[in-house]
Amino acid sequence: MCTGGDSNFQTLAYSRHSVRDFSDKPLSVEQVKKAVKLAQTAPSACNRQSSRIIHVTDREKCEKILNIQGGAKGHSITELLLLVSDLSLYRFLSEMDTPYLDSGIFLMNLLYSCTYYGIDTCPLIWDDYGEKGTELRRILPIGKNMHVIAVIQIGERRENSVHAISHRRPFEDVFVEI
């Protein structure tokens, strides 16, 4: 068990950055599977485990998906992970936000798991409503009960590439004690 004095998680968390410049080297499928398996340790409401991962390695399909997504301009095309949530596991109106909460927790765990296994990532926002969802389903066999939450570019960063330094809000702006 990790304890407060164990800096391994702290080192991992501070070392994770979004990467946008990937090498052409394909990842090992086993490496990706290990990261997803570790991400499955994420908690979920009532242990529903609604998150699913679709690993897309076909470069042509990746390019089409990123064109639909629209925000990955200037990124090198790599492999993608699509995080989807099985909406059939949620039956009540009061649970309508739960797939996003569960998937958000899973996504963060996935990003850390990828970092742990040496896979660089760049999470991208996805709007699964309207035309984008329809276009995506023409490319990939995604069931109607599956809601796309995020697209994650994965790969190995290009040698000598740099990543943006994203400054964090001051701690005092984030933490309130009452």
Predicted regions span which residues?
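Acidic, surface-exposed loops and disordered segments
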Residues: 1-178
